[in-house]
């Protein structure tokens, strides 16, 4: 099984940007933990980060037929990007939205996710563990999809 992890703007600054909100782990630390958990679950991951909305859209579009699940921390684009929402809806690859912090306990403008309606689920507020839970959820989503395909 193949999982595409996409990380949006400013996540390259993890470990130095607002550690009281996002934690002290760097994105490289999180990636290492994700790779370890994915290996335990016999899954492969591709882990990417971009500050550019269009690049994230391109990666989502390219995922069709190559990845079983997309996991996305769209960061600030979560609340603003119709382009990401439309790309997720268009490709038909099951997508899980994740966030390190509990966005609902933060500023009001962070409470609305434009991508949530086209994602199969959300994992928020567990820090680095959000990413580990997303690996486990991806395996679960993939198993459900395989069961549905076998039933047809």
Go through each PLM region and give its residues:
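Short, glycine-/small-residue-rich phosphate/pyrophosphate-handling segment
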Residues: 46, 96, 105-149
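Short Gly/Thr/Asp-enriched flexible loops that form oxyanion-binding sites at enzyme active sites
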Residues: 81-91
């Amino acid at each position: 099984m193949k999982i595409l992890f996409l990380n949006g703007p400013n996540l390259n600054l993890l470990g130095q940007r607002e550690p009281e909100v996002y934690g002290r782990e760097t994105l490289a630390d999180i990636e290492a933990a994700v790779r370890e958990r994915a290996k335990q679950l016999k899954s492969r991951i591709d882990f990417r980060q971009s500050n550019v909305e269009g690049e994230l859209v391109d990666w989502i579009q390219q995922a069709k037929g190559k990845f079983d699940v997309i996991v996305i921390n769209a960061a600030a684009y979560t609340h603003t990007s119709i382009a990401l929402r439309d790309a997720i809806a268009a490709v038909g690859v099951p997508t899980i939205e994740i966030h390190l912090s509990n966005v609902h306990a933060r500023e009001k403008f962070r409470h609305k996710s434009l991508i949530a309606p086209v994602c199969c689920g959300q994992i928020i507020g567990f820090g680095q563990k959000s990413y580990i839970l997303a690996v486990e959820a991806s395996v679960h989503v993939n198993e459900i999809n395989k069961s549905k395909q076998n039933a047809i």
